[in-house]
Curated annotation (Swiss-Prot):
Function field: Modulates RecA activity.
Pfam families cross-referenced by the UniProt entry: RecX_HTH1, RecX_HTH2, RecX_HTH3
Lineage, broadest ranks: Bacteria, Pseudomonadati, Pseudomonadota, Gammaproteobacteria, Enterobacterales
Keywords from the UniProt entry: Cytoplasm
Protein family membership: Belongs to the RecX family.
Protein name: Regulatory protein RecX
Length: 166
């Protein structure tokens, strides 16, 4: 027989919530902490959980120890996912920074990922502007602006026109 949630300890409720959150997708440690202390929706509207800092630390430590939470795995999956969606290294780094990932972890993962950013930038430009890519200055500037917005580095963008003669 299960206990009603009001009688369960704060730690047990918090651990249950953490596992449900991490079952959906990987999260960074900072994201998980933020979601665990955020109010939950109940039948009566938003309901704040009574979470002590000690309980939060115990739950996060348990998740890390049992490999439910791993920033390195999260970073690798995040880089792969965002690059498949056409985003460049600068944008991915910035988003990971916002998610609370240490710069060293991001740098290491970016070095280890096997992504050809120049060809990915070219694919994005071709998808948006067609083949062949424009060679007129004003049109080239539009392509460059688009790719910079997507997070590609200027040297990768310039490499498109150097390496791939239309």
């Amino acid at each position: 027989m299960t206990e009603p949630s009001s009688r369960r300890s704060g730690y047990a409720r918090l651990l249950d919530r953490a596992i449900r959150i991490l079952a959906m997708r990987d999260h960074s440690e900072q994201e998980l902490r933020r979601k665990l202390v955020a109010p939950v929706m109940s039948k009566n509207g938003p309901e704040a959980l009574d979470v002590t800092p000690d309980e939060l630390e115990q739950v996060v430590a348990w998740c890390i120890e049992n490999r439910y939470l791993d920033d390195n795995r999260f970073v690798g999956q995040f880089i792969a996912s965002r690059s498949r969606k056409g985003y460049g290294p600068a944008r991915i780094r910035q988003e990971l920074s916002q998610k609370g990932i240490a710069r060293q972890v991001v740098d290491q993962a970016m070095r280890e990922c096997d992504i050809d950013w120049v060809s990915l930038a070219r694919e994005q430009a071709q998808r948006k502007y067609g083949e062949p890519l424009p060679s007129a200055f004003t049109e080239k500037v539009k392509v460059q602006r688009f790719l910079l917005y997507r997070g590609y580095l200027m040297e990768d963008i310039q490499e498109i026109w150097r390496n791939f003669a239309d």
